[in-house]
Amino acid sequence: FVCFFKSKEKVYNCLFFKKIGFYLMLLSLPGVIFKMFITLKMVISSGYLSLYVDTPNSGVERVIEFVSYKLYIIGVSFYISSNLSKKDFFKLSLFTLPISIAYLLSGKRGDLGITILFLIWYWFSFIELHKISFKKLLLSSLLIFIPIALLFQAVNDSRENGNSNGANIITNLSSFFAQQGVSGIVLPYYIEYEYSLPKDYPYLISPIVDRLNRGAQSSDLLKNTNYLGAELTAVLDYEAFLRGEGVGTTYITELYSIGNSKVSVFTGMFLLGIAILYFELNRNRPMLKYLSYLVLSTILFLPRGELFELFYEFILLIIIWHVAKIFMQSKVIKY
């Protein structure tokens, strides 16, 4: 057991991967800007919920959004797989943060939160390795967290009410914390309405089985997929579902739905804990650094998201990683 978790340090600085990542990020930039423009345009004209009920009219728009997003993820992943200097890290931040801020303006808060947390984790895991005192860590966390929490709450008020409610700091912080627990109602709702919900196959694997049929919230989505969040929202309030509203989902409910048992929850969380521990102990391995953005995104979204939401992104990145290694070896490009 101890040998299994023994960290296998293999730190290297592959200039080839860093260059690939940087150029792919630049290549994705026009498409990402276009996607942000379309997103902001939809929100301004039709409101935040239009993101969940409307789809681009042109197939070209879908292709641009799909390709640019994949190039962005691949580029960032290759870039962070090498040993970044502080200068390289700031380049990464200057590229990723403005994109996340643009999504924040459209009402999507999660992208900015995940980006900031990932950058902080990466900085202290690979750039600044010296220990920091608890007091400094606590103070820094508060200085970062409080403004972001207030900003997120203002965005939430704006997308729900059209403007900020002008409440004081304490009220806004309290509202922010209260909203973080909203996904806690998903499991009670599931238990109450489980006999009204379809169970063609486990909700846990819906992101894998139904990925190609994922789309706007509509009757077709309910007919062709088995997403827990969509099915549960439709059972609670079908009209609200069609308007783009949703109760969300959580991996705990996905696990519980397998046999409607606490055992499945504990088993799933135990296995997930092992996977996270393995990742943390071996994070210096090049491939795990390469996958770290997706890993952190998955972990941070788990309380309010699906366990396998990024399944195909992981598969794509793993395939591309091995293809890139084969290409390097064929060109005699040394690590």
Model-assigned labels for residue ranges:
Residues 51-60, 149-272:
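Small-residue-enriched transmembrane helix-hairpin modules in multi-pass membrane proteins
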Residues 244-335:
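Hydrophobic alpha-helical segments
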Residues 42, 69, 77, 116, ...:
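Enrichment for repetitive, rod-forming helical segments
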Residues 80-84, 212, 216, 275-279, ...:
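Hydrophobic, Leu/Ile/Phe/Ala-enriched alpha-helical segments that form helix-helix packing faces
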Residues 1, 23-30, 140-148, 313, ...:
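Hydrophobic alpha-helical membrane-embedded or membrane-associated segments
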Residues 3-135, 144-161, 232-238, 242, ...:
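Membrane-embedded catalytic interface detector for glycan/lipid assembly enzymes
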Residues 16, 60, 64, 86-93, ...:
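Structural motif marking the loop-to-transmembrane transition
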Residues 91-101, 138-144, 269-273, 289-299:
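Central hydrophobic cores of alpha-helical transmembrane segments
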